[in-house]
Amino acid sequence: MSTQKQIRNIAIIAHVDHGKTTMVDQLLRQSGTFADHEKVVDTVMDNNAIEKERGITILAKNCAVTWEGTHINIVDTPGHADFGGEVERALSMVDGVVLLIDAQEGPMPQTRFVTKKALALGLKPILVVNKVDKPGARPDFVVNAAFDLFDKLGATDEQLDFPVVYASGINGWSSLEEGAPGEQWGPDMSALFNTVLKHVPAQKGDPAAPLQLQISALDFSTFVGRIGVGRISQGTIKPMMDVVVMEGPDGKAIKGRVNQVLTFQGLERVQATEAGPGEIVLINGIADLNIGVTVTDSANPAPLPMLKVDEPTLTMNFCVNTSPLAGREGKFVTSRQIWDRLQKELQHNVALRVKETDEEGIFEVMGRGELHLTILLENMRREGFEMAVSKPRVVMKDVDGEKFEPIELVTADIEEQHQGGVMQALGERKGELVNMEPDGRGRVRLEYRIPARGLIGFTNEFLNLTRGSGLISNIFDSYEAHKGDIGGRKQGVLISMDDGEIFTYALGKLDDRGRMFVRANDPVYEGMIVGIHSRDNDLVVNATRTKQLTNFRVSGKEDAIKITPPIELTLEYGVEFIEDDELVEITPKSVRLRKRHLKESDRKRASR
């Protein structure tokens, strides 16, 4: 009987690259989830193409293992504040959290965000110090830093009394003892499994009570339609059972019938004849499933309050592509197709907001950060969409007639030699130094509070200032009074004056004017940005110029044209680079930059 099933529900929290997905791989392997004949893929939890490429987790996902007769549901949470909507939903399904921290780096801002949410929900943490076998590991420092972090985030005394497990995800072992560096500890992950069984509370719901199942995530299948994922708080659910769906206690009760009930086993979804309290289930057959609704008993409805999600902090305009090259590379180019795709995204991307503007073909899309919105753009681009987007703007709040803006907490890990340049750049962007911590090995950690506006476009500058050796991460802190104007881009751009194809001869002539974004034989059009000017003003250039051929021969060989390689234009770079009067043109094959007004005369008129 499912009512007697021993269940534990845990979420795994970690900063990017601290080893969370590798750790989950090991838990699946060692619990016997993969049969001997199965091929085990690395990073099984990152199953979205962009997640695998970037090594980040975007979508909250579930898997389950069985250890000593107990069914353990593992929810993989995104470590990034931009996917906070995913985080909040994932945490609503669990009773405990495993906080995974790199033994060398210590707690990072993204970890802080998810941990704060988990502690506020009253979840008890288990600290896993990962990668303890790597050189430079500082397990003691990490445990103390985690304690200080929990204390700062308002943890209770019970939450501060957390168990610690030392582990190496890649080598597949864990231990409750710190041991000497280089010493081989426990042979497997049993120390971590046993800690979870001991410290994560078992489900206390009554299987005979009216059903309460809150939907925390949605999936879609072409065969069965919408699929809801959530945890049963109380009661029992069975296939073909009549239920009602309610949006919180004041919501209208919509009748429905459950078709199938599935549970997680490893990475697979298996059909169940019934499921009881504590189980994370997937149900289908009900059309009105949305995130946060409660599926409850039709005779005695017992709805739960709707899930709360933080409001968006950043907004962008998505527009129909109106450039002369529009429609050549994409399959979906009309405003109706873009609008329908954004509406579909809203069904499962709860932190997103979309609204129509007064101008035809322009939609305002609000999200939790630059990464949140550029991942959506990248997904749409891969699906065959073509569009143009504006520079991101922050979402201001009006408090008693005064303008308030979002403030971010930034942590930068840099080499000491780059400290001056980075501090100057953050200072110019209205950043306030909160903390500075040298690690005694030539690197220093800077903590700043800075308006979110000041961070738009800062990533590229930061990488240049630190020669690619710096690490930076940021997290939303609070809304505060507007901090005043922040300067824009320091350099102007090179703008094409004509439609056509760019030639090597023209590139050679423009080489000393600045850095180019285009290569020989690329198509260009009037108003397209072809490069960065070496000065602070915009310059209109002839990018389609060819060499005039005459019937005179010249003595000596012609000079070889020297061309500096162009800047690789990515979607993120483009979105960070542009100013208010510019757009990024996105197609499945290309990313181009352009002026909002393509003709020089229109630009002059608009600037008056």
Question: How would you describe each model-predicted region?
Answer:
Residues 1, 590-592, 598-608:
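Acidic, low-complexity intrinsically disordered tails
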Residues 1-101, 105, 145, 218-221:
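P-loop NTPase switch module centered on the Walker A-proximal segment
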Residues 39-43, 153-165, 203-214, 250-264, ...:
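Interdomain boundary/hinge elements
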Residues 323-346, 564:
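A short, contiguous, amphipathic alpha-helix enriched in charged residues
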